[in-house]
Amino acid sequence: AVRDGLIPNVFSADGNHAYNSADASLWYVWAVQQMLKALPDRKGLIRERCWPVIKNIIEHYGGGKVPFVAPDAEGFLSVGNPGTQLTWMDAVANGRPVTPRHGQPVEISALWYNALAFADSLAKAFGEPEWRRTKQLDAMRSVFFKRYWVTDERGDYLADVWRDGGVETCVRPNQLFALSLPYPVLDEERYASVLSRVRRCLLTPYGLRTLAPSAPGYRPLYEGGPAERDEAYHQGTVWPWLLGAYGEAVLRAAWDVPGSVRELLRTIRPLFAQHLGDAGIGSVSEIFDGDPPHLPNGCIAQAWSVAECLRLLHLLKEAAPGIYAEWEANARKGGN
């Protein structure tokens, strides 16, 4: 189903798949990384089945062969125009994108860097030097910091979108991917300030808000008719799937891993102790209101919510098995 470097973002039974996403192909690369982590002895399979696809993606994205993606002189990707919605924040209301993110969205830049860095490592392992990008990667890290780093009276964080002539400085969770991906584009000494801002503005017991409450356009509740709900979908509404990236970033930045694991388990306790008995019984909803009490909404059993919550638990168990076992035992007894 790969076509001109693009992975479908929607599969159709009749074969007319949708290819209107800038990030699906880059998430494919991440999925291959997860497979390699889980099955380190299957590098031969990756070379045979996945490596050609990854090279196809990089060739088309980096060569300007994807209609809505254009590489710039520094190696980053500009996507879309004011009338498109090509990232996961893709809601449309009254014929216009609710969350315009044309230009260089921070997670697209992070995913692209991660894809290039992974390809560089595979090219080294497979003896294909023509696919190595070491010098380009070093330069991209410096450019990324200059473009996206924001300092205001409340601290430092990463802008959500960079465009020629300015940046979107609203605080959104997409900046987490610059820390959490296998090859992070942000330098390690910057992690703490980003996480501090995300924790203060976006973190809830059920996931992360899509926009800080102090921002213009913040919608505290997911309610009303279709247009009103679409207006709120990525404008403050909480998404559980983002907990995976948040937990990964916290663990990567942690100087006290056991303490960080305990903090994360305390934070998500209501999600597992209370929510699993609400909405879709035994499952995790798609979204929650941005404001307390964070009522669940959307799909009552959402695959990506479940998947990333399970991945987070796996990461925490791997990082501190004893602490996780204690938490799990208490959870089964109904304790805290």
Task: Write out the residue ranges for each language-model feature.
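Acidic, mature catalytic/reactive cores of soluble proteins
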Residues: 1-336
